[in-house]
Amino acid sequence: MIIDCHGHYTTEPDQLHDFRKRQIAALQDPSRRPSPASLKISDDELRATVEGAQLKFQRERGTNLTIFSPRAMGMAHHIGDASVSLVWSQICNELIHRICTIYPKNFIGVCQLPQSPGVDPKTCVSELERCVTEFGFVGCNLNPDPSGGHWSGPPMSDRWWYPLYEKMVEIDVPAMIHVSASCNPNFHTTGVHYLNGDTTAFMQFLTSDLFKDFPTLKFIIPHGGGAVPYHWGRYRGLAQDMKLPPLEELLLQNVFFDTCVYHLPGIELLTKVIPVDNILFASEMVGAVRGIDPQTGHYYDDTKRYIDQVVWLSEQDKWKIFEGNSRKVYGRLNARLERSTKTG
């Protein structure tokens, strides 16, 4: 089985975008907020949004399952307040659940959290628990910077985040570190802010005792880990200068990296630097980079093709990257797959 651990619902129906526009337009007058019940999307309309996109690419590229979540840029936690974020997150998560119900062999859900700048993360616990226990989701996307590029909140190592981490450990789900849209003009969203968020989270983990407090807490850092693999020597050296244990001991029981890296040399670097046991296959198809690479004639985000070309990866290595590591990191995934096989 080929498991893609990083997929977003980027082909949403127009009705969802219209609802969001009405929600934002009502920020100054809460009495005008649209009711979630006003959003009408049929199952056939949902099918139409993925049949020609995510499902098409699954079939063409030979992948089997996508761990699927709402559009990352669309989370936009900096817009509105916590009540706006909650309604928006619930709606987006419910659409993911419906798609996973229609296509149980193709998609398994990961939830958007109703974060809001300056608001205690424990307010996200109920939505996380709902999505995991009621919808069968296997993880969450966690935004380290709900302010949208201004980094106004506590670092991820701060005890402020602990109520959320406690629930993640209790129900055995990991979080993918994923910022959302940038409202800071200095930081392009997908070219800078995403990679900055990945790199920042890693360094916050490195300089903390977080995994002493939560030895089973797990994070996936997407987009190949931001700058981390390229500067692995820097991070090893910083840890050494701080009299910390080696990174393998300090972080790599808890921190994992995906393969959303869009050229072969980048994947080669990732697989040379990061232990195979810490790499999860992912493509983020129909995501940040959607075009065809003129140098190869293939889509940039067809990342399976790159992994297949890495000559030093054994068949066992590739099995770990494509399947085994996702089954290990997403603690609820095996049981969820068994249920979908029986019902699909």
Regions found by a protein language model. Name each.
Residues 4, 206-250:
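Aromatic-lined glycan-binding groove of carbohydrate-active enzymes
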Residues 48-52, 121, 125, 158, ...:
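Structural motif corresponding to alpha-helix initiation and N-cap regions
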Residues 3-7, 66-68, 108-111, 140-142, ...:
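Hydrophobic faces of well-ordered beta-strands that scaffold small-molecule active sites
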Residues 135-138, 169-174, 190, 214-217, ...:
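Glycine-enriched alpha-helix->loop->beta-strand junction motifs that scaffold or abut catalytic
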Residues 104-105, 136, 163, 212-216, ...:
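Proline-centered flexible-loop/turn and helix-kink motifs
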Residues 64-201:
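Active-site gating/metal-coordination segments in enzymes
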Residues 1-5, 12-65, 94-102, 126-130, ...:
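Mid-to-C-terminal alpha-helical segments outside catalytic/metal-binding sites
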Residues 8-10, 145-147, 180-181, 225, ...:
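Catalytic metal-binding/acid-base residues of hydrolase active sites
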